[in-house]
Swiss-Prot record:
Organism: Thryptomene saxicola
InterPro entries: Domain_X, Maturase_MatK, Maturase_MatK_N
The protein, known as: Maturase K
Function field: Usually encoded in the trnK tRNA gene intron. Probably assists in splicing its own and other chloroplast group II introns.
Pfam families: Intron_maturas2, MatK_N
């Protein structure tokens, strides 16, 4: 019991109570906008004194709490012209600074946790592609997978209550409550409001969303560890914090008084893998369908009865891994069963042995990718290249460099694909779209433009690995076939390419 209590309790020494006064510090807004600390963020008028920034912040906060925000005096609209351009501008300015402030307790807690545990601080950036070698190694031994969309909180007040155990300043919590209702304007959070909120203030949205996800993941990790002899190992960092003390005490009561441990014992699964990405997560396990269904209803009950998030059990599908394709980070991944027949003969008896080998494959989903190219005006709905509108003063070299950079980024991102044929089609679209855009900017025909540039223009669209490998290996059929089927994972990619982010 003491061991579990120590696992769940949080040291209060790193909790700071006074965050609201930081809103009146100019450097907070400099950090929020990545500006220099000696530059004013709230206004561009040189006639203002920098010392009056706190007064402007006070005026903005006062205006936010007014019932009718559209009524401004003519004098104020002249002196504060930046307020009249957009009715949500003053709210957005304060919310961007507030997003920096609420991150402070979590950042201090993380630093304190690393120092207390004497963990080596890694300054290397983690690559998105580092997850794929892990999946190639683990998924071939698993049988079932569930792809789940993480539910949002129904009531906005739950997000505020989540942060109460970190942010003790009531003024900051009231301001956060105002921001949530300002953007969503409803007790129910539809997807369109969440999308608008994420675009209006992505930093604050990501902070609230990650705190919501970390809340349920921490309890799920705790209960998962009690359900198996093997402790789970995580490749990420979980913040140790207070997770609804009343609910934690309820967990202890159920766990120890109602023989809950025996119930979890039936869920024992030492081969479960949990991966979260883009508002979704999937559970993969080497287990029976019955136990996967038990974990399914267990998660639903955890969300509904302990986190008040409405979630239907029918939205969680349990699929056999070799029959299911997983859309993951711009790839479509699946496990294929490749059969190999071995003929062996012992004396006069002939034996045929059929072995089924599992292979993890990652392919490029060409239809969604062409849809992204269509939205970016590189091609039409059928995948035919078109001229992308460009600035009239752009030179040919600027247009070509921009297309080359897009093509190189896509090639690097999808270099781990099992089949490169669809990737070559994307290169073809970008190459001809570049020619059409440059010819339109130069008021010439495509034929004339290509003839003027020569064959060197086409060679520039080769990626770095294709150029290097073509110099090392001879141009034989077997070599080109191996390069076509080979996986090349770039371990320096830290963000999802915009064209592969279909959602």
């Amino acid at each position: 019991m003491e061991e579990f209590q120590g696992y769940l309790e949080v040291d209060r020494s790193q909790q700071h109570d006074l965050l609201y006064p930081l809103l009146f510090r100019e450097y907070i807004y400099a950090l929020a906008h990545d500006h220099g600390l000696n530059r004013s963020i709230l206004f561009e008028n040189a006639g203002y004194d920098n010392k009056s920034s706190s007064i402007i912040v006070k005026r903005l906060i006062t205006r936010m709490y007014q019932q009718n925000r559209l009524i401004f005096s003519s004098k104020d609209s002249i002196q504060n012209q930046f307020i009249g351009h957009n009715k949500n501008l003053y709210s957005q300015i304060i919310s961007e600074g507030f997003a920096v402030i609420v991150e402070i307790p979590f950042s201090l807690r993380l630093v304190f946790s690393l120092e207390r545990k004497e963990m080596a601080k890694s300054h290397n950036l983690r690559s998105i592609h580092s997850i794929f070698p892990f999946l190639e190694d683990k998924f071939t031994h698993l049988d079932y997978v569930s792809d789940v969309l993480i539910p949002y909180y129904i009531h906005l007040e739950i997000l505020v209550q989540t942060l109460r155990y970190w942010v003790k300043d009531s003024s900051s919590l009231h301001l956060l409550r105002f921001f949530l209702h300002e953007y969503c304007n409803s007790l129910i959070t539809p997807k369109k409001h969440i999308t608008f909120f994420s675009k209006g203030n992505p930093r604050l949205f990501l902070f609230l969303y990650n705190s919501h996800i970390c809340e349920y993941e921490y309890i799920f990790l705790f209960l998962r560890n009690q359900s198996s002899h093997l402790r789970s190992t995580s490749s990420g960092i979980f913040f140790e914090r207070i997770y609804f003390y009343v609910k934690i005490e309820h967990f202890f009561k159920v766990f120890f008084d109602n023989n809950f441990q025996c119930t979890l014992w039936f869920f024992k699964d030492p081969f479960m893998h949990y991966v979260r990405y883009q508002g979704k997560f999937f559970l993969a396990s080497k287990d029976t369908s019955l136990r996967m269904n038990k974990w399914k209803y267990y998660l639903v009950n955890l969300w509904q009865y302990h986190f008040y998030a409405w979630f239907k059990p029918g939205r969680i599908d349990i699929n056999q891994l070799f029959k299911y394709s997983l859309d993951f980070l711009g790839y479509r991944s699946n496990v294929r069963l490749n059969s190999s027949v071995v003929r062996s003969q012992m004396l006069z008896n002939l034996f045929l042995i059929n072995n089924a080998m599992k292979k993890f494959e990652t392919i490029v989903p060409i239809i969604p990718l062409i849809g992204s190219l269509y939205k970016a005006n590189f091609c039409n709905t059928f995948g035919h290249p078109i001229s992308k509108p460009t600035r009239t003063d752009s030179s040919d070299s600027d247009i070509i460099d921009r297309f080359l950079r897009i093509c190189r980024n896509l090639s690097h991102y999808h270099s781990g694909s099992s089949k490169k044929k669809s990737l070559y089609r994307v290169k073809y679209i970008l190459r001809l779209s570049c020619v059409x855009x440059x010819x339109x900017x130069x008021x010439x025909t495509v034929r004339t433009f290509v003839k003027r540039l020569g064959s060197e223009f086409l060679e520039e669209f080769l990626t770095e690995e294709e150029v290097v490998l073509s110099l090392i290996f001879p141009r034989t059929y077997s070599t080109s076939r191996r390069l076509y089927r080979g996986h090349i994972w770039y371990l320096d990619i830290t963000s999802i390419n915009d064209l592969v982010n279909y959602e």
